[in-house]
């Protein structure tokens, strides 16, 4: 009987990241899915990224994950959301060619070292108990009754766990239209006393592109050039297309209101739907005063006739969906290729998980993705990569786990929210959830996380080397700017007013001022010429180039440093290019802008890391701490927080209780040290 170090159940976004991560760490990994042809399927919208979500994709990529590389191979329309605001809230987003995205994912998964893929359904686990009476995974059991030995299982069932699809009054057992749901597996989780809940989501009808009147619609042009997600992608090669915008109207709303009683939402009221991605029925009911709602018409591929109307997810009867669609401007003759529907499914209470995403009830069992109550491809991928990493590390008998914190990533924010607060509705990431969002931006995910991944052999040397070159380039550009200095009085003659404190400012210092950019630096120091800002109006994207005029002189000194586009850092060769890469300039400018705030924030983050990372022993008996109420003890015993930081975020745990635990742990540590002396 063959044995695998790690078995991943489910081939969606969480499952693919989990399997690839485990395999990268050298674990013999099995990805088991009910249908190989649907690996990497984009079940809902044909897009990756968005506000906060796009940062997660870059974080996954910084850890050598696969989502960023796949979307770069499939990107057909790219935008930066919130581009007119600060860099901390920029949200890269790309429309995908569905077929190209799935192809890219499958090429990686099906050809990955240490990774086997099998087409099968999993119904049960073989669970035994160790000498301490703790249950642990020994094998999975497939629907055919076959046992596959493993000590680590990552469960990524998406919406398939006892999934039910609803179109009007019609209900079909399915996790996605056309795919069967996982019923036996849901029963297995109940058998092992996992707390299950019910959530729902939905998707809009798909339209035939040839039946839409595009000429009367509002065009939305993407960024030019499109921005890659992966730090290893040099440029997007796919042709770029436009999206279009239309709106519902009063007639549309009358049709919906007249048929609300026929919508699945009318009998699924007790099952919570996504707050931030509501159905059109929910919008019409909740915002009755509004006469229209925006709809984005998104192409599903370059050679695909299907259009995704983002904004009108619904579960109305098919004939009502047709009437509703045809009441909308530009869609008067549009034909529906596939109706919209709602899907309800089981999820587990994520408070039953550690920050590694291992369950507290069964050792070696990990959950990732929508099974934890989240919504979105990106949230699933972020959980998948963490679960896969920790499953592989544990399988290799390594004591350390891999946990990202709120201070260093959006993935850390999400997982911390899930395991400490739980969910009452489908969880979606936003920048507002991150206390330290100034430090965890889309531009610096590699600088935050790639070294961490490389330290555990997760990240390839190619990516690590690229990061080192980038860091060297940033440092040398900063040093160059720090060598240029000016007094407040001299700045006044340049038309720039700052405090007359007599202190000389460097060019790097000046970049932190809100009214000073690369253009101003060029005016102050003529040797920095051709500092250009390009704005395509549609995307409000800034491209900065810096050229040093000194090296353009025929008799330039050979010692002048020049930018090398091939190696990615400064060198002294006369033959190399002198154009500073936009990525490096942008990194320096953003860091300079945020530096005054980051310095203050770093002090808070340092304290949080030191105090909040204080470990709490497994199965710690809180009743031995005097002063804790029975309610506090009950909550702590149930959730079993691994650190003080986790305990602090549990609802109902008072600051006084946290102090009592900290004091007890410190006294205990002191006694142990004294006894061993």
UniProtKB/Swiss-Prot annotation:
Short name of any one Pfam family annotated for the protein: SAM_GIDA_C
Function of the protein: NAD-binding protein involved in the addition of a carboxymethylaminomethyl (cmnm) group at the wobble position (U34) of certain tRNAs, forming tRNA-cmnm(5)s(2)U34.
Sites where the protein binds NAD(+): 273-287
GO molecular function terms attached to this record: flavin adenine dinucleotide binding
Subunit and partners: Homodimer. Heterotetramer of two MnmE and two MnmG subunits.
PANTHER family cross-referenced by the UniProt entry: GLUCOSE INHIBITED DIVISION PROTEIN A (PTHR11806), PROTEIN MTO1 HOMOLOG, MITOCHONDRIAL (PTHR11806:SF0)
Localisation: Cytoplasm
Entry superkingdom: Bacteria
Cofactors demanded by this protein: FAD
Positions of disulphide bridges: none
Keywords, in A-Z order: Cytoplasm, FAD, Flavoprotein, NAD, tRNA processing
Source organism: Wolbachia sp. subsp. Brugia malayi (strain TRS)
Residues reported to bind FAD: 10-15
Recorded GO CC terms: cytosol
One GO term (biological process): tRNA methylation
Protein name in UniProt: tRNA uridine 5-carboxymethylaminomethyl modification enzyme MnmG
Organism lineage: Bacteria, Pseudomonadati, Pseudomonadota, Alphaproteobacteria, Rickettsiales
UniProt similarity note: Belongs to the MnmG family.
